[in-house]
Amino acid sequence: MSGSYAGAPGTGAESSARFTGEESTGPAGKPGTGSAEEAGGRRRRRSCRALPAGRPVGLFCGLTVVDVIQLVEAPPGPDDKVVALDQLVAAGGPATNAAVAFAALGGRAILAAPVGAGPLAELVRADLAATGVELIDCSGGPGGSDRSVLDLGAPSAGAPEIRGEDAPAAGAGLPAAGAPVPVVPEAPGLSVSSCVITAATGQRSVVSTNARAVAVTAPLDRYVARVDRGRRPPPDVVLIDGHNPALAEVSLDLAARAGALTVMDAGSWKDAAARLPGRCDVVAASARFYPPGPTGSVTAPRDVAHWLLDAGARGVVITRGARPALWWCAGGHDSVAPPQVAAVDTLGAGDVFHGALAHALAGTRRDDLTGPALGAAVERACDVAAASTEVFGTRAWRQRLD
C-alpha cells in the first residue's frame, strides 16, 4: 500500500510537511516512550541524488496494478463531476513502485509479479521498460510465465539488455509475419487503482480491488534456476510486499541461498502473510500494521516493534505520516526526522521510501546490520521519499535526483 503523508500545507497540521515516522524510543534496541522529535527531530539538509557506487541487484516480489491518477482542486462530491488539473496512468503497487525507485537510484531492479496479457498488461510492461525495471511475469493467466519480458524479443528502450548465452534469438517470442494476433482476456490478478490527489494538500484517496485471487503457477522457477547455476547474478537485496505470499516464500528461499538481505514492506497486516515478517531481516511497517496479540491487535508502535523483533526480524522501521521515522535493531534505536517539503502529491511516497531503503541496504550482510547502518539507510530513504512528494505523479520525481 502506498505510504501515507500528513501535515501538508493547507491541512492545518503543519506549515511545512515532512514525510514518515512517529513515536519515541527507549533503552538501546527496544522501543520506549517520549517525544520522537526530541529523539531525532533535528533538521537536516536533504540529499537524494543517485549514489555512484557499484550497481546493486534488487529483486522485488509482490503486487502490480495500473494506477490511474488524477490531480484535482477538490475531490468530487456525491453525484458530482470535476475537471482534473493533470493526469497520469502508470504501473503501481508497493513492490512495483519500490522497484522503480531502486532503478532510479542506480540499481538493477527485477520485479516478479503476476501481470498476464491484454491491453493493461502491455501498458504495465511499457511503463516498466521505460523506467528500467525488468519484469518477470509470474501470472497463471494467459501469457503468464516466469520468463522475463526481456527474454521475449528485443529489449525495450530503457531496460537492461540480456547478452551472452541468455540472449534470445532474433524474433524469439514474436508471432510469425501475417499470423493473426490472438485476443486474450486480462489476467485475473491485474487490478486498477483509481487515485485522486488534492492539489492544495497533496493528500490522496485511493480505490482499488488490490490483489485478487490468482494462481501463481510459475513462481520464479526459471529465474531461480539461472541464479543457482551462476547464469544470472544473485540479488543483493530482496524486497517483498506481503502480496502473493507463495511467491514471496520462493524469493526468500533464494535470498537465503544467495546471502542477500531481505526487506518486507509491511503496509498492513495480512493473515495470509503471517509467516513472512519472521523470515525477513528488516521489516518496514506502516502505522497501520497491527499484528495479532493475546488480547487483540497490537497497535502501539513500540509494541509492534517488540512483536516483530521477537518474530525474528533483525531490524524494524516504523513510519507514520509526517513525523520522524523510528528504527530498532540489536545495535540500538533512534528516530529520523525527514526534511521539510511542500507536498504536491503523496501517492506512492511510502513505496519510494521502501525502494530507497532497499537500495541503501543492498549488499549489507545480515551480521553487519548495525544501528549506524540501519539508521543511515532510514535517513537516506526519508530524503528520497520526501523529494518524491514535491511533484505530481509517481514518475516525475526521478528527474529531480540531484
Predicted regions and their residues:
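Conserved phosphate-binding/catalytic region of the ribokinase-like
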Residues: 1-57, 83, 298-402
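Conserved phosphate-binding/catalytic loop of the ribokinase/pfkB sugar-kinase fold
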Residues: 162-166, 184-188, 193-237, 242
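Structural motif
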Residues: 57-59, 236-237, 282
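Glycine-rich phosphate/adenosyl-contacting loop at the front of the ribokinase-like
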Residues: 1-21, 25-26, 34-133, 145-148, ...
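Conserved phosphate/ATP/ADP-binding segment of small-molecule kinases
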Residues: 249-335
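Short gly/ser/thr-rich secondary-structure transition/capping motifs
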Residues: 41-44, 213-216, 262-268, 367-368
